[in-house]
Amino acid sequence: MEFRDSPKEAEFRAEVRSFLDKEFPPEFSNRPTEWGLFNAAGRMSGDFAGFMRSWTPKLNERGWGAPAWPKEHGGGGLSVTEQFILSEEFAWRRAPRPGGIGHGWAGPTIMVYGTEEQKQEFLPKIISGEHHWCQLFSEPGAGSDLASLQTRAVRDGDDYVVNGQKIWTSGAHHADMGILIARTDPGAPKHRGISYFLLNMKTPGITVRPLVNMLSSHEFNEVYFEDVRVPASNLLGEENRGWYLAATTLDFERSGIATSVAHQLIVQDLRQFANESRVGRANVQRNPALRVELAERAIEAQVEGLISYRIISMQNRGEIPNKESSIAKLYSSELDVRLAVTAMHLAGLHSQIVDRDDESAMGGRFPRFYMHSTTSPIGGGTSEIQRNIIATRGLALPRA
């Protein structure tokens, strides 16, 4: 594994840094919680929303809005290492990149399995930001065991009629399109008989109900389908082969360098809090073990980065990082929780005060981070699922 950039990679890294120096307002670097997140009202702050309207076209001009996409589809056509460098440099500046379900999941899956008509219809609107996408996979009783889903899609002439329910759908309340898996052959084994659809979220019969979390944030939703008609032309791939498409989609979700950098930035923030704030200094002086705890988190964040480097190295050799991706996901999720606990220890009683209270620590970020971290071992595949993958595929242990 080579840690140093080649001359070509160093030139690209310098290009990215120069772009950020010129185009990215440094005042936004201190507001990382806004990137990709919506407030309780479901709207971005006005100044940030205005910035993104001018920022996204600048990225698309360079192909950086979708760096992994081929150039013929409006992407950057970057190598795996160049994508890694771009993600790393943007993460250190806390600079936003277009992303989400459309860029990361729907688009790549359409490129692999879509017809030419589907590619021409949907891919340009993902790149331009005209279409925002959501993922309609999980159901009550079909989360980790996704193949147990019960939502039905029945062929009726030139349409499929969909009935059922999805849950934990991020961003459904502002999505234009969704990737939907539904059962089209209830008599087939559960991993078969599932089909994959590209769904217009404005179709009559779709009801989106908010799920407000303990942070008073509206990110997740329940989505109900009542006789929703989906054109057969929006079936992606073959009927009853949707499970294999869904597996491809989920393969695009990986723990990358951006998460490691985010954790290293949190360590920097905590170190600054310990050195400069009255509360942080007092707690560290009373409890020297906090120094050790913070040092452990700093080391673990560095290790997380090395795991990401290993995955990139494997991809450059044409290898599939199967168990390694699970190792990265497990390590990152568990570190998220440990970092949040360390932050709470560091702020002491002040860690319980939220938002803009005068007595809150760092604007109330500590309790929000702590509560949000509890979702990390669940989203994107639970820690238990990752351990099973590591055991069976990595250690060749028998299934329980």
List each model region and its residues.
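N-terminal glycine-rich flavin-associated loop
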Residues: 98-117, 143
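Glycine-rich beta->alpha junctions and the first turn(s) of the following alpha-helix
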Residues: 206-304, 376, 392
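Amphipathic, small/basic residue-rich leader segments at the start of a protein or domain
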Residues: 1-100, 121-128, 256, 351-358, ...
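C-terminal helix-coil-helix/basic helical segment that borders enzyme active sites and/or dimer interfaces
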Residues: 30-39, 279, 284-291, 302-358
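Glycine-rich phosphate/cofactor-binding loops in nucleotide/flavin-utilizing enzymes
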Residues: 2-5, 81, 85-86, 105, ...
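A short core secondary-structure module
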Residues: 158-159, 163-209
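A structural signal for short hydrophobic beta-strand segments in well-ordered beta-sheet cores
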Residues: 151-154
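A short, Trp-centered hydrophobic/proline-enriched beta-strand micro-motif
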Residues: 129-137, 181
